[in-house]
């Protein structure tokens, strides 16, 4: 993105914030989703996972906005990821064929925030 002066913004990290009602309950759920403990716990009501270099998911206690978020994760092998999630006790939804070879599945955290797994994602279609 260019600033008003025409210079590029220097973005180093992108953080997806997921508001929840109970950070400890959600921590356990996201630990199951990611298969590991959080990378950081910078404050009592926030835990975060680095999911790709420069890309973070922050789970933040915010009763007013809990359940209002959608986070999309593009994965290489959708079926393998879904099998792993089922093995860990999560319940992803049915796979839906989208467009141009893209396939989708969704699941919800304890507050109803939607997590979409996307197979067949490409930068250019």
What are these regions (language model features)?
Residues 46-48, 56, 72, 92, ...:
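Short hydrophobic/aromatic beta-strand element in the GNAT-like acyltransferase core
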Residues 34-41, 91-95:
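Short secondary-structure junctions
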Residues 2-8, 13-21, 63-125:
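Vicinal oxygen chelate
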Residues 36-69, 114-120:
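Conserved short beta-strand elements that form part of the metal-binding/catalytic scaffold
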Residues 24-33, 114:
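Conserved active-site alpha-helix within GNAT-family acetyltransferase domains
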Residues 1-27, 54, 69-71, 121-125:
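N-terminal beta-strand motif that seeds the catalytic metal site of vicinal oxygen chelate
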